[in-house]
């Protein structure tokens, strides 16, 4: 009975490891796609994850509703 429990634990851990690897691959693909875009489009595409204050406050990103306002309060940060 203990052998079955250990096998089940190994299977569950294996499935979790595969899912974690797939998630990392997805993040990498999203990053690669965003880097292939022109700078203005890339900035707008980061609306769900502004990388830093300089990007958030740059002129090309000066449209908080379209860019980084979801994670950064651009009006407050850039004031």
Swiss-Prot record:
Glycosylation sites (chain numbering): 71
Example of a GO cellular component annotation carried by this entry: extracellular region
Keywords on record: Disulfide bond, Glycoprotein, Ion channel impairing toxin, Knottin, Secreted, Signal, Toxin
Localization terms from the record: Secreted
Family label: Belongs to the neurotoxin 13 (insecticidal toxin ABC) family. ICK-21 subfamily.
Domain topic, free-text comment: The presence of a 'disulfide through disulfide knot' structurally defines this protein as a knottin.
Name by which UniProt lists this protein: Toxin ICK-20
